[in-house]
């Protein structure tokens, strides 16, 4: 069976990479209001993450009292070369950006749907702004920031003829001084 799988795999992989999949017309619609957070007409920052080849993406700003956050969702209906969730061309900010500097990255554990999950935390700084960014990937109900686990989940989906769609979730809040108040906004 190993020889059979080894012989068939290149043809199957080529089929998967070239199969027609409807991606036209995909739209992400976020709610106008949720748990006291209300959609704002204008963003609080011009910063946006850089994700290549998404089939749908959106970025909206929400306010709740004096708290403000931005939500970015990037959706990949199917994974293909140059249109994949795990890709070195996807990043929060390019190196040597003319306005923004990455001043810190690390892992953080937060509660998502009542379960502790590890997310990526990034701190960005511009001359007059500072941003706290939390990001993670969603693949078949699994949240991860680990690119190896994500690639493993995608390979498993291909092997089992399952969907290989995925999304990146990025939430952002401004801060002054230390990012503690921004973290409270993002967690609520």
Locations of regions flagged by a protein language model:
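Internal/C-terminal transmembrane anchor helices
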Residues: 1-16
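Residues in intrinsically disordered, low-complexity segments of regulatory proteins
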Residues: 8, 36, 46, 99, ...
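Short secondary-structure boundary micro-motifs
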Residues: 13, 21, 43-46, 106-108, ...
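Alpha-helical transmembrane signal-anchor/signal-peptide segments
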Residues: 15-34
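Residues embedded in well-ordered secondary-structure elements
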Residues: 26, 49-51, 158
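Hydrophobic/aromatic-rich, well-ordered segments within soluble, folded domains that form packed cores
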Residues: 31-32, 38-39, 166, 170-172
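Short extracytoplasmic
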Residues: 32-63
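A cross-kingdom signal targeting lumenal/periplasmic-facing segments of multi-pass membrane
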Residues: 58, 62-186
């Amino acid at each position: 069976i190993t020889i059979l799988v080894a012989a068939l795999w290149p043809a199957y992989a080529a089929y998967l990479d070239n199969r027609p999949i409807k991606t036209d017309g995909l739209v992400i619609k976020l709610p106008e209001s949720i748990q006291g957070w209300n959609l704002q007409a204008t963003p609080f920052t011009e910063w946006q993450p850089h994700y290549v080849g998404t089939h749908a993406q959106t970025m909206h700003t929400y306010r709740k009292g004096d708290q403000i956050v931005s939500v970015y969702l990037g959706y990949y209906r199917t994974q293909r070369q140059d249109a994949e969730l795990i890709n070195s061309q996807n990043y929060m900010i390019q190196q040597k950006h003319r306005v923004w500097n990455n001043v810190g990255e690390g892992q953080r554990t937060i509660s998502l749907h009542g379960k502790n999950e590890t997310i990526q935390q990034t701190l960005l700084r511009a001359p007059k702004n500072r941003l706290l960014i939390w990001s993670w990937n969603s693949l078949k109900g699994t949240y991860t920031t680990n690119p190896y686990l994500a690639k493993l989940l995608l390979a498993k989906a291909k092997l089992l003829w399952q969907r290989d769609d995925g999304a990146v979730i990025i939430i952002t809040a401004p801060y002054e001084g230390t990012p503690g108040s921004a973290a409270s906004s993002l967690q609520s």
